[in-house]
Amino acid sequence: HFIVIFRDVRGAIASMFSRADKNFKAPSTISFLRCWRKQVAFSAMMSESNLFNKRISFIKYENLVSDPEKEIAQLCSDLNIKYSSDMIDTKNFVGLGTNIKQWVPNSGYVDVPRTGIFNGSIERWRETLDETMISFIEFIAGPELKYLGYDLVNRDNYSKPKKRFYNIILEENNNSLGWRTDNNDAALDFSFEILRHFCLANNLDDLNIIKRFFLFPKIPFL
């Protein structure tokens, strides 16, 4: 059984920007967004495949931390196992793999309590990200955010390219020290995103172009 957890990518990026670890090398924002989009694309494909029928569960991070009992109880139902309140007691959490020590929070924010399920960061991106960055994120990942049911700040014009978006890509292209999946060419990457919106607006049916921009021959949010 596969369990996929989605998080509003605006919140994920805000958390990344807020990391107190000065040694952390953040990826370029466009690279982060493109990797997040791939997760959505693969999940959409899996949800429609008979191969994964009744073998995949989707959870929104925001719902999970807001009402963990409800979300985990539903997951237990999907897995046909009995729910226990111990499942959401963080004192019982351990690390991944060989790390069997007690789990500790790894949020980018410094005010996260050491125990309990913290939900204070869900909407914090609205305060910590400036208007330009929010618009840029929605320009790159707006269709996927809408597909997952997240409301957009710029719902009426999120697909409109702006020069300051290019400037973000260019600046990070020159200064980012973290991992990246871009083309190392700001103009090319910006053009790619403009063409992606053109494909959506015009319902192009060229399978090669669709796969180029959306990973699979079917666009899930059309």
Language-model-detected regions and their locations in the chain:
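PAPS-dependent sulfotransferases, especially Golgi type II membrane carbohydrate sulfotransferases
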Residues: I81-L222
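PAPS-dependent sulfotransferase catalytic domain
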Residues: H1-D89, F93-V112
